């Protein structure tokens, strides 16, 4: 029997409708361009956009090394790809403007809750199992994602939230799963993890010793989950078949 359960975020509890990610990206570029102009720092919009694109690719490379950078580190990364000296030219007001421009667009163009996400978390909570979240953060950092989860009514079910930008570790790092296990003082074999990504979620959690349930039909790429479900409302049955819950 398991003593705790953990969830991935994107593709598991929330997802983006078509075009929302692009709208979010364009808003980020526009807000950054406008914030820089307010500070008397005039850059071509195309240069700002190009800087974000290259910085996003660099962030992916950082994640590939199973590490991450802080929320402020994201802003620095993006700004340096616009102008290497730009971060050194900002005062406190400038940092506030740019942090907001870079980090918060998801509050305006929000993701959508996965079907049955709230009901699934509520059902697990009734069992008395602690629920954790382990998520890699992209351009949107953990503190913004918590605000979104709170607005969706999901945060109240989560007893621990581990975001990559806050621990500076990224899935599939074994260490980020161990960090989450420590939150509940449970052994890997006493916990299950639910996620959609074959490498980040399935391989990562299995390598850390957790029971693994994959949601969705993304190819396993050699990483085999203990169980697979199409929708969250199938999770209880999957856990019972694995004899992890009564």
Each model region followed by its residue ranges:
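Asp-based, Mg2+/Mn2+-dependent phosphohydrolase catalytic module
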Residues: 1-5, 9, 22, 38-46, ...
């Amino acid at each position: 029997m398991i003593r705790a359960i953990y969830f991935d975020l994107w593709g598991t509890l929330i997802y983006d409708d078509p075009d929302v990610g692009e709208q979010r990206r364009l808003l980020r570029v526009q807000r950054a361009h406008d914030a820089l102009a307010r500070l008397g720092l005039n850059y071509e919009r195309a240069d700002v956009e190009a800087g974000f694109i290259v910085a996003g690719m660099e962030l992916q490379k950082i994640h590939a090394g199973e590490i991450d950078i802080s929320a402020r580190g994201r802003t620095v990364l993006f700004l340096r790809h616009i102008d290497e000296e730009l971060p050194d030219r900002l005062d406190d007001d400038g940092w506030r403007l740019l942090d907001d421009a870079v980090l918060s667009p998801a509050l305006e163009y929000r993701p959508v809750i996965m079907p049955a996400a709230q009901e699934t978390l509520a059902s697990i909570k009734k069992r008395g199992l602690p629920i954790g979240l382990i998520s890699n953060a992209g351009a949107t950092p953990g503190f913004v994602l918590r605000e979104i989860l709170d607005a969706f009514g999901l945060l109240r079910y989560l007893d621990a939230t581990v975001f990559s930008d806050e621990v500076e570790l990224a899935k599939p790092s074994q260490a980020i799963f161990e960090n989450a296990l420590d939150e509940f003082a449970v052994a890997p074999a006493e916990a299950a993890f639910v996620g959609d990504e074959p490498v980040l979620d399935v391989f990562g959690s299995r390598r850390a010793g957790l029971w693994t349930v994959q949601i969705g039909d993304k190819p396993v790429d050699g990483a085999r989950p203990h169980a697979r479900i199409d929708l969250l409302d199938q999770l209880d049955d999957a856990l019972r078949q694995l004899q992890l819950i009564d």
